Every structure is written in structure tokens, then in C-alpha cells.
Regions:
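Transmembrane beta-barrel domains of Gram-negative outer membranes and organellar outer membranes
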Residues: 21-265
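Bacterial N-terminal signal peptides that target proteins for export
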Residues: 1-9
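Gram-negative bacterial Sec-dependent N-terminal signal peptides
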Residues: 10-14
Length: 265
């Protein structure tokens, strides 16, 4: 598509009735799975200002491609590939280094759908394995194979408001993506996420979340705690734009960041 045709294409597509269908920008996973024999694509860019402990690296840019496929009605397969750029202080000769990060391969199984009249939430379970495809010399990868298992609970509080909670454990490896996340080689890492998202129309969702991680020895200043405010806007029934602003505490979290992405069904 020619560059000058893109704005016209997006405008025309936005004239159609659209409904939001996207997880990003939120890190809190949902209990839904991709419909059987269909693909779901997500791509986003997150630019973060790092904690002072990461110096001389000052900022990190992470471009992530995620592709999901509905194998059955309740089973989804996924692959996640990040491209990471680390921006250094001026005291470092190489101003920036970049390359592929560690790739993730996962599956999600929906155990229970939410039902009208029931107080029980929807439940799903997710397993991810992360391959050490990123360069450890450039600090783009952990050099470890990660195994992560977590559960999802999702409940509609009203017709327009949905709460989601995730909780899990990394049995091996660590939670780092580039210089963000817990970088440990031994012991377990416990993770937790919670989000509240409200639908203001068929096109617009707004929400907030908090997510974090801590090692098995519970040293908080080496942990991760991040909050995010995000939005999802459906251009069409297939294309959703996403935006988020986030900030965090402790060494494993970014000080501040901004997210911009889209999803396609």
C-alpha cells in the first residue's frame, strides 16, 4: 500500500461498526481464547525510561510481535518475538545496541466460561516456555530457558466493567525482557497482575492495572511493581489501536514508559 493511501484507508475502514477485541496494552491476561482455526495478531512498541540501577543504559525500546492461533474452541497457541533496543548514556561509545530478544512459545486453555446468573468467574490456565534467543553479551537476552505457569480469573462486574486477576510462578529462568524484569538464575519468581477495564462504547475501552513480580526470597527492592493506564479503540471489527502510559518502582521496573500498538483478528 502506498504511504499516501494509508490515511484514506484507515478513515474508510473506521466508518464500519467496530467492536474492541484486544488484550494489549494491558499485561494482565484475559480468559478468552482465539476462536477455532483463526489467527490473532498483536504488535506494539513500548518505550521505557529505566531505573538508575540500569546506568549507563538509560532507556529501552521494545517492539513486540505476537501471533495466536485457535487450535480448538478452548485451546490457543501463541508465539511472541521482541526486538529490543537499549539506549546508553553519552559516556558510552556505542549510543545504542539492538537485536532480537528471547522468544516465547505458549498455550492457553479456557477451563470455564463466565455464565449468566453465576457468581463464579471465567477461568483459564497458561503455560509459556521462553527460548534464550537474545544476545546475553548485548544484554538483550537472559541466556536461560524460562518456564512460566499462571492462572487467570475474569469476572464481569457490570455489563461494561470487567475485572481480571492473574497469578503464577516461573519455575525456571527469570522474568526479564532486556533490562526490564527480574534477572535471577536461581529460585522461583512469583508473578501477579490485576486489571479493571470499562467499555464506554463498542469502540472504546479504558482501564487500569497493576502488575509485579518477586523472587522466592522476597527481596522487594530487587522486585518489580508497575502500574498502567491504557486505552483500546476499535477502528474496525478487525483492527484495534492501543495506547498506554505506565510507571513503576523497584529495580526490575521501568521508571516510566509509553505504549502504542494495534491488534488484528
Amino acid at each position: 500500500m502506498r504511504p499516501h493511501c494509508l490515511p484514506v484507508f484507515l478513515f474508510c475502514m473506521s466508518l464500519y461498526t467496530a467492536t474492541v477485541y484486544s488484550q494489549i496494552p494491558f499485561y494482565t491476561d484475559d480468559a478468552d481464547t482465539t476462536p477455532k482455526r483463526q489467527f490473532h495478531l498483536e504488535m506494539y512498541n513500548e518505550h521505557d525510561v529505566l531505573q538508575k540501577s540500569a546506568y549507563p543504559v538509560k532507556r529501552q525500546n521494545t517492539l513486540v510481535f505476537t501471533l495466536n492461533y485457535g487450535l480448538t474452541k478452548n485451546l490457543e497457541l501463541g508465539v511472541n518475538a521482541p526486538f529490543i533496543t537499549l539506549i546508553n548514556s553519552r559516556i558510552v561509545e556505542s549510543g545504542a545496541v539492538g537485536g532480537q530478544g528471547d522468544m516465547q512459545f505458549g498455550m492457553k486453555y479456557k477451563l470455564r466460561a463466565e455464565r449468566d446468573g453465576s457468581k463464579l468467574p471465567a477461568f483459564a490456565i497458561v503455560f509459556y516456555a521462553e527460548a534464550p534467543t537474545g544476545s546475553t553479551r548485548k544484554e538483550l537476552g537472559s541466556g536461560l530457558t524460562d518456564y512460566w505457569l499462571y492462572g487467570i480469573a475474569q469476572k464481569s462486574l457490570t455489563k461494561r466493567t470487567t475485572a481480571r486477576v492473574n497469578g503464577g510462578v516461573l519455575f525456571s529462568g527469570n522474568s526479564s525482557t532486556g533490562l526490564i524484569g527480574i534477572r535471577t538464575e536461581r529460585g522461583h519468581v512469583y508473578t501477579g497482575n490485576a486489571s479493571l477495564v470499562r467499555s464506554f462504547s463498542n469502540k472504546l475501552n479504558l482501564g487500569a492495572e497493576v502488575f509485579g513480580a518477586v523472587t522466592s526470597n522476597f527481596i522487594l527492592d530487587r522486585g518489580q511493581l508497575t502500574g498502567q493506564i491504557g486505552a483500546q479503540y476499535a477502528l474496525t471489527n478487525k483492527v484495534t489501536l492501543t495506547f498506554g502510559v505506565l510507571g513503576g518502582r523497584f529495580n526490575a521496573s521501568p521508571r516510566a514508559g509509553v505504549h502504542l500498538g494495534f491488534s488484528y483478528n
